[in-house]
Amino acid sequence: MAALQSAPDSPATQLEPAEDGSECDADPEEEEEEEQQEEEDEEEEEEVVVEEVATPVQEVAEVEVEANSADNGGGDDDDDGGGGDDDVEEVLAEEQTLSLGTQERHSNGGHAKAPVLQGKALQTSRVSPTTQDEDVEEEEEEEDEEHFLTQGLVTFEDVAVYFSLEEWERLGVDQRDLYREVMQENYGILVSLGYPIPKPDLIFHLEQGEEPWVEDGPHPEEGDVVTGVYTGAWFWNDDIEDHEEEDDEDFLAEVAEEENEPPGLWSAAYGVGDVPGTWGPDDSDSVQTPEGWGPNPGSLGILAEEVEAKHFLSGREPGENFLVPWAFPAVAVPIGCPETTCDVCGKVFPHRSRLAKHQRYHAAVKPFGCDECGKGFVYRSHLAIHQRTHTGEKPFPCPDCGKRFVYKSHLVTHRRIHTGERPYRCVFCGAGFGRRSYLVTHQRTHTGERPYPCLHCGRSFSQSSALARHQAVHTADRPHCCPDCGQAFRLRADFQRHRRSGGCTEPSSGDGARMAPHEVGMAPNEVEMAVAAVATVEPEELEAAPAETEEPEAGVADGDTEAEARQDEQVVVAPAAEATVPDSKKDPEPDRRFREMGNGLAEGEGPSSHPFGFHFPMHPKSWLHPDGFPILGFPEFSERLQADGRHLPGPLGSPLSLQGMGLACDPFRSVGPGAGVDGGLRAFPPAVRSLLSEPAPAALAEEESPWICSDCGKTFGRRAALAKHQRYHAGERPHRCADCGKSFVYGSHLARHRRTHTGERPFPCPECGARFARGSHLAAHVRGHTGEKPFVCGVCGAGFSRRAHLTAHGRAHTGERPYACAECGRRFGQSAALTRHQWAHAEEKPHRCPDCGKGFGHSSDFKRHRRTHTGEKPFRCADCGRGFAQRSNLAKHRRGHTGERPFPCPECGKRFSQRSVLVTHQRTHTGERPYLCSNCGRRFSQSSHLLTHMKTHRGPGSAPAHTSSTKAQAPAKATPPLPPPGSGSGTLLEFAGGTSFGSDPAAFAGPSGSYEESIL
């Protein structure tokens, strides 16, 4: 317990000086009594408060003294720390009881009899207040109830205990496990009681299996980022899912770094998000500071969770300061240094000058404005950082590849691509990631979480970017327009990529045919058909004067319901024959896109405030007729028209008249070079319009526009994937290994390659514990345990656990030998066989046998050869104990015990355990007899039969017979005389493949002349 008692920042130590009331935080009731009561009543009330606070502290001290005395007098058995677990558990329980009871007492308006979360120590030792004190408290309870409710929120910090590194190292393994268990249990209790507490960093790191110690050191200065504290520390807002806001987040991080301010404060001050005065989900991170140096830890997080996406200024005047004191109801202003405490957010500063500078954020004073965009900033340094976005300055270069970045955080993240560093590990599969946000997104594949639902169709997605791409199916809006070439983009990321590429082309002026989609920056197989639900147009109305219009209700999407569709039919619009296309292509506000339609509409009005449309993937050749307007040409919709009984006035692709058509004009998305009606107008028949008001088919909603590689024809769902793929064809390999210099196309390939240098094998087998560097290798290995062979040969039915093995096996049927030797031209079916063969041509054979002098180019071949001299047989059968020199021979032998017969005869179906036995058996069907007796010319199908037959030519006392055997297709060779029987020199057998001597019946020379060992 020395570690707990000696901790300088432990809760018990911090509460000890409160016994005399000298440093105890004054009860909030004292502030009210200074204005309402006399000085005597104030002193009396203060004594009661001090007495109530000091009594629990005395109990904690008494409990610790009793625990220490029990430890000292408990006998020799406790000297070795055997009772450390009980001490840690007791102190943690007391701390939890004290903190929870005190907080609950405050949350009940200061009532002395609040029963919830009261510990036994508080119940037995509480000094009962006098009747007069109870009356005073009851009178002020209603008055201060709201104030206490806001300041009495229980946070995890109130029941948490922290250790320094030195103290943590003193704890035993059991004590550390007990600490982890108690901390997680405390958090679970708070959550079960309904407190809106976000998960603290301490619990997160405990779940990750990391050490929870707190780094020693002096208190940081105001605003410093405390990187050594796992809980209660500021952290960078770099885990935002929406990467479109990444620039804003990095700017805030850079500002915080240069101004020595916590980034979370900048997020709150600037209101990261598109809606000013709204606390968005990006601000709900755990905004915490060390005690005494900012808001109550976790309080801002609680606030964000309670009022997430709710306006602070409901009913307020526009432009009024939204960061007012009532906007932070959960922040308690520290007592004791009010002259340096912010009365808005409760942050404490060491000097008044720092407080005055900080209050600029709340007062919205931004004296430094940007000349380019007019954006204001509190500090000049912030303006300098912001101006990099206009000047293009990138002061942070990568030392490896030279690429430059605007923000230092971008450089740090980019550097991980070169180093292969992946500091964030998945607890489920061990996969590593370079960003925490990537880890969070990846873990959703394990948990199945899909937090981003589509408001149109209800489909959910695990990533916000996937939702954004999906929503393009439901809307035709392209709010990001290029001022140079006029191309419009749905996503800001696509627009920024277009601007960086510098591929803008000015549209040519003059009349001309409408451009194809691929000529205006659209996907080659994507056609955008935007329809605004307006009234039909009669021919005589085309030349009529503009008429007054009735605009549909703003804010309602057209075509959502049948009633709205009927309402749209009643809208009267008299468009002119020509629509004026503005000179400036700059995209105005989304709700004022149709103001220059040229059809008599008033300024700011339009056919609809929410145009709808869909994207239909189709071949570019059928997307438009050269003499008419683009109309629906997707075959699937043609079938739908026929099924629904709706007919177009003409065949698909034919010229279309404006009579009876609905018109829609968006001049800021006009793609044709000519002016007039074609400059942004789209015409569709009513039948098509009613179809488009219905939800898109699931197949169309799911389908992505493929991007085709012009080199190999491979298709991709995204342009970024195609760009990465084209690196293969271009030979670009930007990711280089620092150890061996090998280059890779993808950063993930480099990270996987790095494991060959580090020896890391993050994928363990759950069956045998073997570890692998790749997940695919582990999957193939697991099939060895399960016996699964999903890759089956279509010719012979043989199964394989790996696709590569099936591919190599298939070449045995086709006779393909794609690997040729450059030296001799010999071809092989496998690359490994070619590699082994090439050692025969290599002059250098570093592995030479000391017994026979034979050289080998590969160490494995040399080791296998050495076993012929040493007689070593390292592979032993677990059933019979027989040893083998090669693993393959052991595998063949094992089939005799297991009964496995993987080689079936295609003629009769009989199965065999060895391929050589199958080959011998097949001769009974083919009639082949390759073994010839040179004496009588008789043939045999097996060499053993020939050996038995040769004994008939040698009678007792007769001269040795000259015998030989050959294959039928090869002539017999002359053989020397046989040695006399019993000479021990063996029997000479001659084959087309060579000669072999053998006295052991278990050894024989096969038809190929190679030596074979009997396995069974």
From Swiss-Prot:
Q: Where is the composition biased (Low complexity)?
A: 51-60, 570-582, 963-973
Q: Which Gene3D superfamilies does the UniProt entry name for this protein?
A: 6.10.140.140, Classic Zinc Finger (3.30.160.60)
Provide the GO MF annotations for this entry: DNA binding; zinc ion binding
Question: One Pfam family for this entry, by name?
Answer: zf-C2H2
Q: Which UniProt keywords apply?
A: DNA-binding, Metal-binding, Nucleus, Repeat, Transcription, Transcription regulation, Zinc, Zinc-finger
What's in the GO CC field? nucleus
Which InterPro entries does the UniProt entry name for this protein?
Answer: KRAB, KRAB_dom_sf, Znf_C2H2_sf, Znf_C2H2_type
Q: Where is the composition biased (Acidic residues)?
A: 17-50, 74-93, 132-146, 541-553
UniProt lists compositionally biased (Basic and acidic residues) regions at: 583-596
**Disordered: annotated span:** 1-147, 541-606, 950-1016
Instruction: Please report the stretch or stretches of sequence annotated as the KRAB domain.
Output: 154-225
**ZnF bounds (C2H2-type):** 340-362, 368-390, 396-418, 424-446, 452-474, 480-502, 707-729, 735-757, 763-785, 791-813, 819-841, 847-869, 875-897, 903-925, 931-953
**Which terms does the UniProt entry file under GO BP?**
regulation of DNA-templated transcription
Job description of the protein: May be involved in transcriptional regulation.
The record's comment on protein family reads: Belongs to the krueppel C2H2-type zinc-finger protein family.
List the protein's name.
Answer: Zinc finger protein 316
Organism source for this protein? Answer: Mus musculus (Mouse)
Protein's gene: Znf316
